[in-house]
């Protein structure tokens, strides 16, 4: 008799199958139950080790002994006519079938019910933790808080809005550096431009006790700035004044206004602020005008005119090579240009960021913007350790800088440090509560945590503020609520302008693939595959992001491992959501994270929130 036949006769193979399936089921149930009782990790490991060690003795017993009506007997002592091995085999087949059904049922229950709930609970726990911290830290409205509203352009031709906006922003920036003041961010303050809103509403929305209003009138080289400080709760005018000068002394005018505000609010000044609040940025009035014009384009993310802004800043630098802020703003501008144009030479843009950021730092090492610009460029190059250091340096220079807090917060969300990322994101919204993109990301995190109401509220606020890309998130929310018709319409309408380089009509095909039937999904996958196959230097960020949503996580990881995109944020942040679980638990995830540079960052500053480092150096993620 052959060995295989003898193993079958003695029911060893059936015993092995029954043992393995039963052991797997025990391990899975233990993994679910033990954490509920706060059991330490070694208990679960001990169960696995004991079951593994027990396999060999169990097989030896199955080989040596046979189950009879009289109990276990050595196989050689059982006569052929007394053997009930065939009956035992039949019963074992039944047991194996039952245990297998239970195991398969548990596997399905874990994958489709427990796992999403665990992921959502983890994200919700993080969200609640950070929200509690933010809520605990949030004080009552301080009497030393202020919003600087956009000054009105009263120039004869009403064509100097960039200048009036620039004046108010410069004063805002000067006040924001005073640690004893709470200053609302630019985006939120400028939201009320031209709205003639009740100041009590403004104060409540921005969390400030005072607002600074004003107007700017320029004619030829002459400038008149009128400003007034108003208390928001009763509309009481605390102070007002007018200042006359010319374009050669705009910094002196800004200094006088900022100084008057700090005096009125009795702000405590530190260090050099006691003598100077507004440093002279440039000796060239023309260079400063060009800087303000470019800044206006940069602030409204007017991608159509980015090249005009770049040309203007380069001209400003030619007029005054020592104009550090022009160098810094040019670096930041080159950072965002690729996100608005698929035709941008990414390598050249990154080189420009490095060049102008470093020249800005050489001229003025205190410019947080320059370090933030370096950080964002390092992100694109997957130089995450340097990125992290650049953002930390920028925050040390200016803890209230909105751009630094927001960019750094996104970076942390992308790298898996969800808790810290949300702290920075909420810090951003504390300073600038109407920053549309920050609201969009807050909505994304709330959606991941299962908070549909919060996600809807913040996503809609971002959309009302003019952020079109948030339609993608509103579509995801509609889908979560079972409204796929609305989801398709939202996604197609909102993403039409973000699919640069993709075939015309892609927005409809992808939207239907995401929220339609299987046939539509197949068409969308084919479209994405064809696009990625023909793409050259970089691909549109939407492609790998929707690959995951279309049920192709492995393909998305492979694409992101070998291709550059014009914006990695949504994809990398997706890794740490319930939807990204298939990617971060994939056998190829460690190879992916090493290839893109994440592993090096984790080795340097610690594992991400959902992962643990093994003795072998790999990361196991939940």
Which role fits each region the language model picked out?
Residues 40-43, 343-344, 574:
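Short, surface-exposed loop/turn segments at secondary-structure junctions
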Residues 1-119:
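An N-terminal, helix-rich hydrophobic module
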Residues 10, 178, 320, 364, ...:
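Acidic-histidine catalytic/liganding microenvironments
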Residues 53-56, 63-70, 178, 232, ...:
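Phosphate/oxyanion-binding loops and surfaces in catalytic or ligand/nucleic-acid-binding neighborhoods
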Residues 15-16, 184, 273-274, 370, ...:
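Short, hydrophobic secondary-structure boundary micro-motifs
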Residues 357, 405, 417-622:
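Alpha-helical protein-protein interaction modules
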Residues 36, 88-91, 95-96, 100-466, ...:
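Acidic, proline/glycine-rich low-complexity intrinsically disordered segments
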């Amino acid at each position: 008799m052959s060995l295989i036949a003898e193993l079958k006769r003695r029911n060893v193979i059936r015993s092995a199958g029954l043992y393995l399936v039963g052991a797997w089921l025990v391990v899975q149930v233990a993994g679910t139950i033990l954490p509920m009782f706060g059991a330490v990790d070694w208990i679960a490991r001990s169960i696995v080790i004991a079951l593994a060690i027990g396999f060999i003795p169990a097989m030896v017993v199955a080989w040596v002994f046979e189950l009879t009506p009289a109990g276990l007997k050595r196989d050689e002592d059982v006569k052929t006519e007394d053997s009930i091995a065939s009956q035992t085999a039949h019963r074992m087949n039944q047991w194996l079938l039952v245990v297998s059904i239970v195991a398969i049922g548990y596997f399905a229950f874990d994958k489709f019910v427990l796992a999403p709930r665990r992921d959502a609970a983890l994200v919700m726990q993080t969200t609640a933790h950070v929200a509690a911290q933010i809520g605990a830290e949030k004080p009552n409205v301080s009497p030393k808080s202020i919003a600087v509203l956009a000054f009105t352009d009263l120039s004869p031709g009403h064509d100097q809005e960039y200048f009036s906006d620039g004046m108010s922003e410069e004063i805002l920036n000067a006040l924001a550096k005073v640690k004893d003041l709470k200053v609302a961010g630019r985006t939120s303050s400028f939201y009320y431009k031209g709205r003639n809103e009740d100041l009590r509403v403004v104060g409540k929305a921005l969390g400030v006790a005072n607002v600074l209003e004003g107007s700017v009138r320029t004619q030829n080289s002459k400038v008149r700035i009128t400003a007034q400080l108003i208390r928001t709760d009763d509309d009481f005018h605390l102070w007002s004044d007018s200042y006359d000068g010319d374009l050669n002394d705009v910094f002196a005018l800004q200094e006088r206004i900022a100084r008057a505000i700090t005096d009125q609010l009795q702000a405590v000044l530190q260090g050099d602020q006691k003598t100077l609040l507004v440093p002279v940025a440039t000796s060239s009035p023309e260079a400063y005008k060009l800087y303000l014009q470019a800044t206006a384009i940069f602030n409204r993310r007017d991608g159509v005119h980015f090249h005009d802004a770049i040309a203007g800043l380069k001209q400003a630098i030619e007029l005054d090579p020592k104009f550090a802020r022009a160098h810094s703003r040019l670096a930041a501008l080159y950072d965002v240009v690729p996100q608005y144009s698929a035709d941008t030479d990414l390598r050249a843009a990154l080189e420009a960021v490095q060049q102008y950021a470093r020249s800005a730092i050489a001229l003025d090492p205190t410019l947080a913007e320059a370090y933030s610009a370096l950080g964002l460029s390092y992100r694109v190059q997957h130089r995450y350790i340097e990125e992290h250091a650049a953002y930390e340096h920028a925050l040390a220079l200016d803890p209230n800088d909105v751009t630094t807090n927001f960019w750094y917060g996104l970076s942390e969300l992308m790298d898996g440090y969800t808790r810290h990322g949300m702290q920075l994101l909420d810090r951003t919204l504390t300073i600038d509560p109407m920053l549309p993109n920050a609201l969009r990301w807050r909505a994304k995190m709330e959606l991941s945590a299962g908070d549909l109401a919060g996600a809807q509220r913040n996503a809609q606020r971002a959309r009302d503020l003019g952020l079109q890309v948030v339609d993608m998130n509103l579509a995801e929310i509609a889908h979560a609520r079972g409204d796929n018709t609305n989801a398709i319409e939202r996604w197609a309408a909102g993403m039409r302008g973000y699919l640069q380089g993709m075939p015309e009509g892609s927005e409809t095909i992808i939207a239907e693939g995401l929220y339609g039937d299987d046939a539509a999904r197949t068409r969308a996958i084919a479209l994405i595959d064809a696009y990625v196959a023909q793409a050259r230097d970089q691909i549109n960020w939407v492609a790998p992001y929707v690959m995951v949503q279309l049920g192709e996580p492995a393909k998305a990881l492979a694409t992101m491992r070998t291709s550059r995109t014009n914006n990695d944020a949504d994809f990398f942040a997706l890794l740490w959501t319930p939807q990204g679980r298939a990617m971060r638990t994939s056998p190829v995830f460690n190879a992916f994270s090493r290839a893109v540079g994440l592993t090096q960052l984790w080795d340097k500053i610690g594992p991400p929130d959902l992962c643990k480092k093994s003795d072998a150096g790999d990361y196991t993620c939940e």
